[in-house]
Amino acid sequence: MNKIKLLPLMMALSSVAIAETAPITEVPVEQAMPTITVNAPAVEQTIPAAIPPAQDGVLPQLSFEAQQTRAAELSQRADYAYEQEQLRQEQARKLAEAEQQIQQTVGNNVLLLSSTTAKIYLDNDFTPMWNDHAAVRQFLKEYAAFAASGVSPKSAKALQQILNQPEGLAKDILLTDSFLDYLYYNKNVYRNANNWLYNLGSYSPKSPSEEQIASWVKSVKNGSSGQFVANLVPRNHIYQETVQRLFTMSPGASTSTKKATKGKSKNVATTSADEVATTGSSSFYKLALNAQRLRIIPSFNNGIFVNIPSYQLYYLRDGQLALQSKVIVGREDRRTPVMYSKLSNVVVNPPWNVPTSILTKDIVPKLARNPGIADSLSYEILDGSGNKVNPRSVNWSQYVNAKSVPYRIRQKAGEDSALGRYKFNMPSSDAIYLHDTPNHGLFSRTDRALSSGCVRVNKSSELASILLREAGWSAEKQQSVLASKKTTSVNIRSDNPVYLYYVTSWVEGGKVHTLPDIYKLDSNIPKTSISWNKVKSVI
């Protein structure tokens, strides 16, 4: 018998001679193999002389021949782990060298995503990625509009580095590094809009997914990188018009704005219909920031659009205006959130389950002063088991400053209900929806930031009629159900996306429009140091 082949077996047997019968315990690679420390340019390696055999509770129970097979399997497994660790260490060494090489190439310029950028050039033999000049111009136009918005000061500095860098591999590397930043932003801004676009300073450049990078590299290799970059541009025509206007301006400059007129708007989705828009000027930076806020809307073609500071709802079908209505939105301390959802159903004669925040902040203090309002407002007080409770039997004063109350309140359906006659549901983690209101007199006010977050619709009856008609309801059935005061829910058949967004400055039809910044979200916009004339010269 070959003694060399028996050596691993003998080592394995000796290592488990005292092992108890137990499930197999595999030692992680990190324990089985000391790691290699890479300090570019010198690379120190600590490699073991031999790999300790893994303890195996199964081995002592096997026959001698089975033990041989088992020991061989363990040895092969250890060899494979060793080879994989060697490969990983070699890849890490090459990547560290590549990262050092690209940093030396770009000199004092700061890379946003140096490791990911280095890997791209390492995998592609350091060949230039930006030979398509049309792709360069298209990318720089979009990246400049993003950088000017103040969303990412680091991106603005990265753009300026590109503008200052002469042609060559260094500029190519800077372009790739910034493009990775743009890829990540463009892909993720939709789900992070509330933070990135309305809480300036929260965005941080990160690497895009490997799939995105692979798709872009593939387009570079097959000569279609220009089309790849062009496909990243939002199709929203108002976004495109707004960005285009930026390149006719200079930072620090203002542009004249158009005052909205009364009556039905001929423009789409964003213009106020009751003199909400203001005259004056819109700064370069404000316009740049609001252009980014328009990115979250694919197009103004189908769906319900509510630009929160305009106090208007627009319902579009195939690009045509089906309904325009005044709305009431959340007040400053209970803001209507920026969000995207879809209408799921219409509720006729909806009851109102009072949210906890409104219960504790608004209703409990009123009940403490006068429990009788529960009867006048058709409130039902329910305990934790759902049993009705006499409002006069509760000492409401003890809950005036409490964060929670051991009761729920439900308001019965009816014209006097806080939700009015119709509720338009949409899946939302914020419990935000559209609804009617019993107090239509408030729609005559100019400032309509009055609700607790939901959107009250002046023409809710007309909106419900459109949606119910599509569900097969006649006008007679609609009126009959309303009169019955019976709560009825009807699923919506058509696809109706809902966009709640916040834009205070934009360009539409060649005109700049502005709205009051009702939530103070345009204050303290960072003024980036970008050579805008250089930007305009390269795009």
Question: For each of these PLM feature ranges, what is it?
Answer:
Residues 21-202:
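Cationic-aromatic interfacial patches
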Residues 11-13, 91, 121, 137-144, ...:
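Generic hydrophobic, helix-prone segments enriched in Leu/Val/Ile
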Residues 1-20:
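Gram-negative bacterial Sec-dependent N-terminal signal peptides
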Residues 2, 27-80, 200, 218-539:
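Well-ordered beta-sheet/strand-loop patches within structured domains
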Residues 190, 213-216:
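A sensor for short, sequence-defined functional sites
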Residues 202-213:
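Eukaryote-specific, cytoplasm-facing alpha-helical/coiled-coil scaffolding segments in long proteins
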Residues 16, 179, 424:
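A residue-level signal for conserved active-site and pocket-lining positions in enzyme catalytic cores
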Residues 99-106, 137-146, 206, 387, ...:
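Phosphate-binding glycine-rich loops and adjacent basic patches that engage nucleotide phosphates
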